[in-house]
């Protein structure tokens, strides 16, 4: 056929651990002033217990795509809201980090199959204008040999707290590179 459209919506609201600045009494924003998010999951010290479930985190968005047998093209939008304003002390090393109470990320993705080749990629932009992109190709050259190449470029000011794209570091920011891979299965017993 001519293809079809697919739509997916998502939403989440939960309490998360965060360091609250209790000394900030002059803040004019709604909600507490947050100095950082806690990601360890530990609640064994007094400070960690104070940080437990300190603020509400809300995520919402959707993805729409057009799909045919060989082509998929989509767009994604995601919006995040935090129950307080993140007000980190910005230093040289973190000057481009997210420092607000909400963020929107928009993106477009594609995948094209042609014979034994799969070309794919995604481009994304955060609310502050930071961009991230990756593009790749997988090739099945033979039943025993496959080849892959992936280019990635995550700008220093890209802000997406939940992204988990292919990267060297744990965050998808300030990184550019190319990955090349070869998979070989010389015999049918090769794992």
Question: What spans do the regions from the language model cover?
Answer:
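Hydrophobic or amphipathic alpha-helical targeting/insertion segments
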Residues: 1-2
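Outer-envelope exported proteins of Gram-negative bacteria
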Residues: 8-12
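Amphipathic alpha-helical scaffolding segments
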Residues: 13-17, 81
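A subset of solvent-exposed loop/turn segments in beta-rich extracellular surface proteins, enriched
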Residues: 17-50, 98-103
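Outer-membrane beta-barrel and related beta-rich outer-membrane complex signature
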Residues: 18-28, 85-89, 161-163
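Exposed, low-structure sequence patches enriched in small/polar residues
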Residues: 57, 62-88, 97-191
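Residues lining hydrophobic/aromatic ligand-binding pockets adjacent to catalytic sites
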Residues: 94
């Amino acid at each position: 056929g001519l293809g079809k459209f697919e739509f997916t919506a998502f939403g989440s609201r939960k309490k998360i651990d965060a360091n609250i600045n209790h000394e900030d009494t002059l803040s004019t924003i709604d909600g507490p002033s947050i100095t950082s998010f806690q990601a360890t999951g530990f609640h064994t010290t007094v400070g960690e217990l104070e940080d437990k479930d300190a603020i509400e985190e809300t995520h919402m968005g959707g993805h729409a795509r057009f799909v045919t047998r060989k082509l998929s093209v989509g767009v994604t939008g995601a919006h995040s809201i935090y129950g307080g304003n993140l007000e980190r002390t910005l230093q040289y090393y973190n000057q481009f980090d997210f420092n607000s109470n909400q963020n929107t990320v928009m993106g477009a993705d594609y995948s094209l199959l042609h014979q034994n080749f799969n070309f794919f990629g995604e481009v994304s932009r955060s609310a502050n204008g930071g961009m991230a992109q990756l593009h790749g190709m997988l090739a099945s050259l033979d039943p025993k040999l496959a080849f892959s190449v992936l280019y990635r470029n995550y700008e220093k000011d890209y802000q997406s707290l939940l992204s988990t794209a292919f990267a060297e570091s744990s965050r998808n920011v300030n990184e550019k590179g190319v990955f090349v891979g070869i998979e070989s299965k010389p015999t049918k017993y090769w794992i």
